[in-house]
Each structure stands twice: as structure tokens, then as C-alpha cells.
């Protein structure tokens, strides 16, 4: 049975000033954790220090998790769904 996941719609300005749009997906509805997960992921793509607050990262909705998303959440605690402007 799929777990419920919580989707945080996130828009962050990159170092070169373009906007990256991605969703932070987690199994816990915790805004502060979603922001922390966004910062962790941004650091892995060389965008550490990017501004991520409640303004850039907002709760969007809750839904059932597809298996690959559920597996990554179990492994890392979160999943990043790249939307626009992400490497």
C-alpha cells in the first residue's frame, strides 16, 4: 500500500539568477523539514546558500506515493521532482 506524501512547491533563484522550480516531496507534513531537504538537495547541485524560506517553498498537496518515490523517501527522507530550470 502506498504511503501518503506531501508535496512542497518550490521556486529558488540560482547563482546565475535563473529560477529553478522543483517539488520537495516527503512523508511528513513538516514545512521546516521540507525547507531543510530543499537546502540539502541544492547543496548537491552546487547551489548551497540559495535562499529557501516559507516564501520559496510552500505546501501544495498530499497524495499517494508512486513506488519509486516511496522507495527514495524511505532511503533519503525526501524526493525531489525537478520541474523547470533544474540541472
Each PLM stretch: what is its role?
Residues 1-36, 65:
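Intrinsic disorder/low-complexity detector
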